């Protein structure tokens, strides 16, 4: 006798080079497919992590390119309207895997038999930031209140979220999923195109090159250390919208030889 699988949808803006996107792919790939029918749907069909989605996971891509102002455009439509336009199938569980736009969309589900989950990955600190993808704070509170459960990736994220939104439904902590065996395996790979100078301090950072990561401050600290006679070399693993601006700063301050962008890498 065939057991009916639980249909789960994960909605996320895209599968770009961020940590949440990678973690979602890890999670979806490793969910028990004998019990769950898993789908990942993106608002934008872009991102380096698309290629890592297993064939056992259904993938639904959205718009083929990202464009500025998309969040503001979505605010013109109600959550219910967006949901009915974007989500075409019926699911037992729908997960908004990032705070913001996808949470607003998923909250528009009107099927009482569908369980809704909101997954929060970052500390948002205040009402203004937390409601940036909504029309206002009241709409954000109304939308998040419709979720049966909210998952936060750490205790501090949970505390931050609850300081902004006072929800009746459960808010729980669930740490990110990692493919530990794959990490151990890749740790044995030899990296041949990067050589560390043993006579200087080598600093490696892994993150998107976006304002929130603070790389502008890191470059200034790097320069000050060099000016103070402390030799060091910084390596950045990642890509992002701020890279060209940061590279200009490095050129203007003659730091190109001691601050290296390595780009996105599988390992």
Protein language model annotation of sequence segments:
Residues 96-102, 120:
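Short His-centered aromatic/hydrophobic patch
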Residues 8, 93, 107-127:
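Active-site proximal beta-strand in glycosyltransferases
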Residues 74-80, 115, 124-146:
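Nucleotide-sugar donor phosphate/pyrophosphate-binding loop at the beta->alpha transition
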Residues 5-6, 10-18, 22-26, 30-73, ...:
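N-terminal strand-loop element at the rim of the active site
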């Amino acid at each position: 006798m065939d057991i009916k699988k639980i249909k789960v949808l994960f909605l996320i803006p895209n599968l770009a080079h961020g940590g949440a996107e990678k973690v979602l792919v890890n999670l979806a790939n490793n969910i028990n497919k004998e019990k769950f029918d898993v789908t990942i749907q993106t608002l934008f069909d872009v991102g380096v992590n698309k290629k890592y989605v297993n064939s056992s996971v259904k993938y639904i891509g959205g718009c083929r390119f990202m464009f500025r102002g998309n969040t503001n455009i979505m605010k013109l439509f109600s959550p219910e309207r967006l949901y009915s336009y974007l989500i075409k199938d019926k699911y037992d569980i729908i997960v908004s895997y990032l705070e913001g736009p996808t949470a607003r969309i998923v909250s528009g589900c009107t099927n009482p038999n569908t369980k809704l989950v909101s997954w929060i990955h970052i500390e948002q600190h205040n009402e203004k930031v937390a409601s940036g993808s909504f029309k206002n704070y009241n709409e954000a509170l109304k939308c998040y209140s419709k979720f049966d459960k909210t998952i936060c990736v750490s205790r501090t994220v949970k505390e931050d979220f609850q300081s902004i939104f006072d929800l009746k439904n459960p808010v729980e902590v669930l740490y990110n999923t990692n493919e530990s065996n794959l990490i151990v395996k890749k740790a044995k790979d030899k990296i041949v195109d990067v050589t560390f100078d043993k006579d200087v301090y080598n600093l490696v950072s892994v993150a998107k090159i976006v304002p929130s990561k603070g790389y502008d401050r890191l470059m200034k600290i790097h320069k000050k250390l060099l000016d103070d006679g402390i030799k060091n070399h910084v390596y950045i693993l990642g890509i992002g919208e701020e890279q060209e601006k940061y590279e200009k700063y490095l050129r203007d301050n003659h730091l190109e030889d001691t601050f290296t962008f390595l780009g996105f890498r599988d390992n």
